[in-house]
């Protein structure tokens, strides 16, 4: 009887968690320039994405830190490039995470590990697809929906536009900002994609964060 009661409680908890999953559209969208051949200094001056990635201004990362980023799979490296999960959080828009599963990567994911003392996260920022230039962006698949898990519990589905842009999502306040707290995680699972014109590989150039507790 106790086993049945426990099983019913687990099922009820899972159903409650699923019911709390919210669908989120981007709150802000910043367009990538078509011409990326300009010097980095000029790009930083002219475009908010480059200023955000390379400008060096104070941000959540003044105190925020990620322990590690792991991917469920990654495309095999070529002679010039690799496609590991950590590339999605290296603040380099030309390096990417490309999943390595058969097909278009539905169900593949990234997991970010945060120390308990890390400032809390409120915003997820995504450079969707291979944004290096318009040609490779179209050729490779892009994410249409990402499911977000906080400590393995699903909390949100991010609805990404099919555009070569930086898309920002307000996800609520996540984390502890407590030196006595344990490590916590955010997982991002590919639920749906926009197919590429040439390759099935689904690509994320950058996935990083903004938040509170740093000023």
Where in the sequence are the language-model features?
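Sec-dependent N-terminal signal peptides
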Residues: 4-13
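Sec/Tat signal peptide C-region and signal peptidase I cleavage site
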Residues: 15-19
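Trp- and acidic/polar-enriched beta-sheet ligand-binding modules for extracellular glycan
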Residues: 20-40, 45-46, 104-107, 130-215
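First exposed extracellular module after export/assembly in secreted or surface-exposed proteins
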Residues: 22, 86, 115, 122-126, ...
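Extended extracellular/luminal ectodomain segments enriched in beta-structured repeat modules
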Residues: 105-107, 116-125, 183
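Disordered, acidic Ser/Thr/Pro-rich linker "stalks" and the adjacent N-terminal cap
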Residues: 20-113, 213-215
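Positively charged n-region of N-terminal signal peptides that target proteins for export
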Residues: 1-4, 20
């Amino acid at each position: 009887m106790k086993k049945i009661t426990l099983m019913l409680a687990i099922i009820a908890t899972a159903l409650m968690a699923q019911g709390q999953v919210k669908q989120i559209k981007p709150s802000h969208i910043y367009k990538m320039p078509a011409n990326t051949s300009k010097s980095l200094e000029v790009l930083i001056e002219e475009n908010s994405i480059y200023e955000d990635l390379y400008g060096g201004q104070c941000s959540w990362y003044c105190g925020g830190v990620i322990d590690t980023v792991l991917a469920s799979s990654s495309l095999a490296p070529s002679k010039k490039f690799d496609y590991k999960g950590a590339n999605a959080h290296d603040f380099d828009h030309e390096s990417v995470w490309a999943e390595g599963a058969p097909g278009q990567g539905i169900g593949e994911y990234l997991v970010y590990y945060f120390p308990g003392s890390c400032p809390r996260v409120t915003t997820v920022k995504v450079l969707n697809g291979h944004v290096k230039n318009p040609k490779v962006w179209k050729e490779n698949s892009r994410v249409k929906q990402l499911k977000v898990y906080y400590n393995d519990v699903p909390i949100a589905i991010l609805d990404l536009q099919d555009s070569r842009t930086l898309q920002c999502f307000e996800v609520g306040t996540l984390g502890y900002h407590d030196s006595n707290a344990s490590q916590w995680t955010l997982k991002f699972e590919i639920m749906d994609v926009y197919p590429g014109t040439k390759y099935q590989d689904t690509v994320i150039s950058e996935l990083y964060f903004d938040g509170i507790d740093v000023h």
